[in-house]
Amino acid sequence: MSKVIGIDLGTTNSCVAVMEGGEPVVIANAEGSRTTPSMVAFAESGERLVGQQAKRQAVTNPENTLFAIKRLIGRKYDTEEVRKDISISPFKIVKADNGDAWVEARGKMYSAPEISAMVLQKMKQTAEDYLGETVTDAVITVPAYFNDSQRQATKDAGKIAGLNVLRIINEPTAAALAYGLDKKKDEKIAVFDLGGGTFDISILELGDGVFEVKSTNGDTFLGGEDFDQRVIDWIADEFKKDQGIDLRGDKMALQRLKEAAEKAKCELSTSMETDINLPFITADATGPKHLTMKLSRAKLEALCADLLNKLEGPCRTALKDAGLSPSEVDEVILVGGMTRMPAVQKRVQEIFGKVPNKGVNPDEVVAIGAAIQGGVLRGDVKDVLLLDVTPLSLGIETLGSVMTKLIEKNTTIPCRKSQVFSTASDNQPAVTIHVLQGEREMAIDNKTLGNFELTGIPPAPRGVPQIEVTFDIDANGIVHVSAKDLGTGKEQSIRITASSGLSKEEIDKMVKEAEAHSAEDKKKRELVEARNHADTLSYSTEKSLKEYGDKIGADEKAKIEECLANLRKAMEGSDVEVLKKATDELTQASHKLAEAVYAKAQAEGAQPGGEAAGEASAKDEKVVDADFEEVKDDKK
């Protein structure tokens, strides 16, 4: 079995790791960074940029630079969370035919899994460059509080990226795996994970290689992006008060504000005050305007007070569901970049009554845990058992539009539960079952997973047919449904009408497009490498020709000059094969010139070298020994 990579697909940044020699290793990307911005941009030239390249040009291309797409994955367009995102996004969020929230860039619509797949492809490429081999198997992490649609959409993203997703694993569980792999004692831990876009809290019991999740809770729309937005709004309001200009109407200025807000927030984790300087932020009739402000840590905490207050509720619920008091938790592990904020750490300390553990790298620990889980699935990591839970209850709509729960939240997965249903009227040929996920009492307030129609029921009085419906949650937390007529013993045919998500045809189409892009990217890379090689060769040949051109014949010199001109012309084009051919021709033609350069170098080195050789032969061996001793002394 080939290597299994672990990918932390984050809202703001992503990270990839792999097991090497029994140890997890975080892989640096082509830019040398261990995390990659989860950003995708479409340039005017049609080129697709991912990661750091996309982030660098965001200010000048705000409408076509897509970020925080994880907050849209598996979500409907007509939801409160998406509406909130639409109001602050510089890029267009549009409604797809199936009702999902998609994005638009350069006039083309993309699904959230498709954009996420582009980030995953970048992570896959990073791993392949490091390992020197093709990678297909992966473990991808998701927030623990992701529902079925969001998990399925993440799995679809992996498929589009050309990955075989062996397992979808919850981020706090992955972090616990990384933290507790070498721990020998039994302990109860809380993993507090506040990232760029999501918040999770999981309570686990660790001991003897068993990682058992007792409860999980969270908010899939609370993270660093929300804290940044508070700072952006404050800067924009202050500037409007001072200059009378609202920067929110200028997408380019808004993108600069976003970068400045993120930078200021990060700086205030280590200092009490920071300067925000944005020269030439805008202009009016009086001339250009510059933005200069000071932001203190106290002000930042005041701006984000309500966001900080939102952290407590899920923690209290998770503790209650696990049947533990805060004092019974041995360690609180901090995960996610936002946990570097002192106010967050203080709030965690207040909730749990203990100083949180900062022993793990909050940006990398989730990817490390995913790589360890990959090692478990591959058989490289022994004696580790992971018992995760389903974050949300699963049930169906019953009489009076009430949700009847079949599988309660925090049930260990994989799990299976069956329930017998019957008909509501005489001779009813079909039953429609509305499957729901959530914690609310009424069906309308929960998330619809699908409507399952059981057809071909034999004519019978109401309440007589016995139809057993089985709900199954797999190890990825993804729901499956099957049905059986107990009267006939036959499996009933179920037609599933997915409420959202991508169809198989759409996924297959996106897989093909992703493969085409991958081949295109490879060609571009080949062209860049060929151009670089050609540029180096033409420069060195031209230099050598100036210095040693008189050492070769006129015909040979003319031939080299001709090949040099051909290579320069080929470098202007974009045909790799033509470029390689021109490079080879110049290399062949330059052989005589290379010989002349080499001969001159030898001649220059031969005279002093010859004298030294003569001296050495004229002296006895002791001198050679002394010479050898000197070298050894130098080394010391």
UniProtKB/Swiss-Prot annotation:
Cellular component aspect of the GO annotation: cytosol
Pfam families in the cross-refs: HSP70
MF (Gene Ontology): ATP binding; ATP hydrolysis activity; ATP-dependent protein folding chaperone; heat shock protein binding; protein folding chaperone; unfolded protein binding
Keywords: ATP-binding, Chaperone, Nucleotide-binding, Phosphoprotein, Stress response
Start and end residues of each stretch annotated as Disordered: 602-636
Gene3D superfamilies reported in the protein's UniProt record: 1.20.1270.10, 3.30.420.40, Actin, Chain A, domain 4, Substrate Binding Domain Of DNAk, Chain A, domain 1
PROSITE patterns for this protein: HSP70_1 (PS00297), HSP70_2 (PS00329), HSP70_3 (PS01036)
Gene Ontology process terms (BP): chaperone cofactor-dependent protein refolding; protein refolding
Residues making up the signal peptide according to the UniProt record: none
Positions with biased composition (Acidic residues): 626-636
NCBIfam families attached to this UniProt entry: PRK00290.1, PRK05183.1, prok_dnaK
The family this protein is said to belong to: Belongs to the heat shock protein 70 family.
General function of this protein: Acts as a chaperone.
Protein name in the entry: Chaperone protein DnaK
